[in-house]
């Protein structure tokens, strides 16, 4: 793990709207209010970032998402117009890398990494602005889930082709034609009528015997959906109850939609854990498979050999974690016993861990074990200098 902090200069006239790191953390992509997409690289031991590529888009980019590196350097860019652009980099060059290492000079490798970047595809426009992007686990192929906001004007323009209310569309890269990724509509998740927009998406890691599972957050809560192979449709398995504290925030601040979610790694636990943030409240849910209608006994784990369908999920609100500011992003560590929550408007990250006898299952009370606090003055400086930490 890298120590210290790394700072790269963002040479953009507008504000940085989103930043997304690759799985290895050696590249970061940013999008600005001017419509520019920048890809930065830090592949050496030195804490210096190099600008690999700049792409100007005709519409306003708002969200970024990298796919798993097994599928290459593929970056999805969501826009306020509902279009998703696909930016792709060159494949890794083992020959240039080895020759650079032998000669002790990485100039050819850096030159190769800067070449070959460009737009290689575009997904059909949705009914509203792109609100959420999430690539599926690598075992499920190059599949991208896109969440949209509901837009009456856009829905009238598109008719019933992509739905008339808020929805999540799933696309798959079926192949390459003339150096362009060809994307096909794989499926659609229709959100409740009262949901104004999709707010967040989170895939469960792939596992043998389990159908694809996708957690969807929206303006009226959230739910978990599973792909049913016989009907080739997505089915909602359960809805996520909104904590009482979050409901009070909704009444006081008019609305606190589900902002972020993250699925804890299973690691043979008897139950699943899913964290979701509603404003400053983070809810931790326990998930177990519901018993089939013809059987009153259900297995207490999702991962059952040979199982391809789930009748439903039983949801239990385990605990809530309160913060002094809204939580805009959260993530479990690789073993699922630590939850990091990043605060919005405050340069702080809170780390929570379970305590008590049931801490191995995650059902105990969770408490703050550490905090990372940034420099409050850096926020004002970043706004002036367009810096990204």
Language model region names:
Residues 20-25, 65-72, 134-141, 202-211, ...:
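Loop/turn segments within WD40 beta-propeller blades
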Residues 256-292:
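Loop/turn-rich, solvent-exposed surfaces of beta-rich toroidal or solenoidal domains
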